[in-house]
């Protein structure tokens, strides 16, 4: 799976965390592991321009998704297998997200993880234009975020245990001689 991140926002964010959450959601949603995703982080002025150009709405927004058409290969039945699908682009605005995070009482990292999940779900065809769609998408988004956080906590604890085990083994080597 190829996930490219381009941070043009001027705000320092954990690109590794964005890749981690995107990779987690793509795997959980059973997307082909060879899929490709592009993520761009913009400042509020650039996001406002993009928001006006594509959505005809003034001002910046937190996340925009631009799906590619390659997800549905179509074509002749005897055509060769298509290559890795390009899911599309997710555009995030960390400055806008920071304001939302402060209002919600959580970190920017948490907000960007949530928005990354939201963006991936849009690329996979989920929408929230209708009340039923919104309920389904936001419930899935919340569940995926909860599962990703639990996965991160488990990985952290495993890393700490491995470090403790390594130190214990190092100490025990002093007594072997």
Swiss-Prot record:
The gene is ybeY. Single strand-specific metallo-endoribonuclease involved in late-stage 70S ribosome quality control and in maturation of the 3' terminus of the 16S rRNA. It holds the Pfam family YbeY. Its EC number is 3.1.-.-. The keyword Transmembrane does not apply. Its main location: cytoplasm. Belongs to the endoribonuclease YbeY family. This is Endoribonuclease YbeY. Gene3D superfamilies: Metalloproteases ('zincins'), catalytic domain. The keyword Glycosyltransferase does not apply. The lineage of its organism: Bacteria, Bacillati, Actinomycetota, Actinomycetes, Mycobacteriales. GO terms for molecular function: metalloendopeptidase activity; RNA endonuclease activity; zinc ion binding. Binds 1 zinc ion. Zn(2+) binds at residues 118, 122, 128. It is found in: Cytoplasm. It comes from the Bacteria. Keywords: Cytoplasm, Endonuclease, Hydrolase, Metal-binding, Nuclease, Ribosome biogenesis, rRNA processing, Zinc. GO terms for cellular component: cytoplasm. One of its GO terms (biological process) is rRNA processing. Its cofactor is Zn(2+).
